[in-house]
């Protein structure tokens, strides 16, 4: 397929209306009405962490981050109970950027709150990407850090987290048997193969 055909198909999908249908404490539900490539209307549902005042606001704001932390030759993974799936999964340290907080402040706060660890060095910060593109406009950054310190629990009563550092061999075994969030799984995969 040549580029001009691809471009015409992309341009033929047009968002014509957005309506908020629910305003929850943490999530806002919206119905988007599109005109599809056949010229028919298609209603699509999304959730957003941010208030969207118009179509132009969709996917514009970075709401949080995920932290890929290492200590020497070990990767930080969290065993975390996630209410959305009603089970414990392996996850990265992650969280939402608070009002008035910089990305670097959020990195340090979230790592400390969820693990008790400190940021020794920020290695890299990737540009924000969509966290769940099929259902949400939420954008988060993936951050790579070196962490140090002792594990401590500073989480709220509504969180259950066990943090630990894992070797490449341990991570390889977890990838065969444990359930992961998608971002944690891809970070773990590359770490276990020596790419990270």
Segments (PLM) and residue ranges:
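Acidic, metal-coordinating catalytic segment for phosphate/diphosphate chemistry
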Residues: 24-66
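Conserved Nudix-box catalytic region and its N-terminal flanking loop in Nudix hydrolases
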Residues: 61-109
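Short glycine-rich loop/turn motifs
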Residues: 64-66, 140-142, 160
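Short, Lys/Arg-enriched N-terminal segments with co-localized hydrophobic residues
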Residues: 2-12
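Nudix hydrolase/Nudix homology domain
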Residues: 5, 16-17, 84-89, 95, ...
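Short amphipathic beta-strand and strand-loop transition segments with alternating hydrophobic
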Residues: 12-23
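Active-site segment of metal-dependent pyrophosphate-handling enzymes
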Residues: 70-72, 81-83, 91, 112, ...
């Amino acid at each position: 397929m040549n580029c001009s055909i691809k471009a015409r198909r992309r341009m033929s999908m047009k968002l014509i209306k957005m309506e908020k249908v629910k305003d929850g404490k943490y999530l806002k539900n919206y119905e988007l009405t599109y005109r599809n490539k056949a010229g028919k209307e298609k209603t699509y549902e999304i959730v957003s962490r941010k208030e969207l005042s118009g179509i132009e606001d969709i996917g514009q704001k970075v709401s949080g981050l995920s932290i890929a932390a290492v200590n020497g030759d070990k990767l930080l993974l969290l065993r975390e109970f996630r209410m959305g799936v009603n089970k414990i999964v392996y996850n990265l340290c992650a969280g939402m950027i608070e009002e008035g907080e910089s990305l670097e402040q959020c990195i340090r706060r979230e790592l400390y709150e969820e693990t008790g660890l400190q940021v020794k060095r920020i290695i890299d910060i990737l540009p924000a990407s969509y966290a769940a593109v099929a259902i949400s406009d939420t954008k988060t950054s993936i951050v790579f850090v070196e962490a140090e310190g002792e594990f401590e629990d500073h989480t709220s009563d509504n969180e259950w987290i066990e943090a630990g550092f894992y070797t490449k061999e341990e991570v390889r075994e977890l990838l065969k048997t444990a359930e992961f969030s998608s971002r944690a799984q891809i970070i773990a995969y590359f770490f276990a193969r020596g790419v990270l």
